[in-house]
Amino acid sequence: LIDCVQRFFSKHHVGKLLARCNGMKEKGVSPVSLFRYKLSNIFVGRSMYMQQQTGSFKEAFSKNTFYRFLNSAKTNWLRFTSLLAADIVNHDIKGLTNDSRKNVFIIDDSLFNRTSCKKTELGSKVFDHTDMRFKKGFRMLTLSWSDGNTLIPVNSCLLASAKTTNIIGPVKDFDNRTLAGKRRKLAQTKAPEAMMALLDTALSVGLNADYVLFDSWFSNPVQITAIHSKGMDVIAMIKKSSRIKYSYGGKPVSYTHL
């Protein structure tokens, strides 16, 4: 299994992608070695803590080096996952289907639950659409690419509450020109606007699709027209609103008349 991870890293040039996303170190063990170790542990169900407790940890780096790399505020993980997804789609997936197949972007959000948020940065009370009540944690907004048979996750972001009154955890100050500042600003952006940021990142790395799929939570006229201006059509659930009119049979009609 670890050999499979190594072949995947070599085939998709993961080290170069990390470097393009500022995942670098000044000296010592290479970042790609740290990342390969982390990914290998996930697939084999191991952890650094248990390896150190049992004496089976044989890597040439310390715990502090490993966690400094994972917690670095300078690595653009959102762009990294987008670049990796684009490499997989463009070099492995697209060759398996013909040009007439319609590709899509799929956007959805889910609850990232936390039992306590008092010490979690930007931890919030967020609305769970499944249970129809507020819970502690974040909303996880995810963008995926699909050709109808294969689903490839592209990027994602954690969304805190856009209302400061619903934020439970600490709020740290960062320069908005830095990557850390931009990520925290994105986390406090409303979901329809954050969706456009994820789409723009996916398009900027060479991914493309014919349609964008999402539910009624994102189907606002502003977002639909913005997506259409990027050369894609929208397939979505209609939002129940008396203020929104839809064109049907050449006439503007409300949701209740469709």
Predicted features and spans:
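Gly/serine-rich nucleotide phosphate-binding loop at the start of the catalytic core
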Residues: 1-78
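Short, charged/polar micro-motifs that form catalytic or ligand-binding hotspots
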Residues: 24, 56, 129-133, 185-188, ...
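Short, conserved catalytic/metal-binding motifs centered on acidic residues
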Residues: 37-38, 51-53, 66, 101-115, ...
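Electropositive, glycine- and tryptophan-enriched low-complexity nucleic-acid-binding patches
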Residues: 65, 130-207
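Active-site-proximal, Lys/Arg-enriched surface segment
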Residues: 72-162
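Short, well-ordered, mixed-charge alpha-helical segments that flank or form enzyme active sites
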Residues: 113-116, 151-152, 162-167, 219-222, ...
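Domain-level cores of phosphate- or acyl-group-handling catalytic modules
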Residues: 173-250
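Conserved small/polar residues in nucleotide/adenosyl-binding loops
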Residues: 256-257
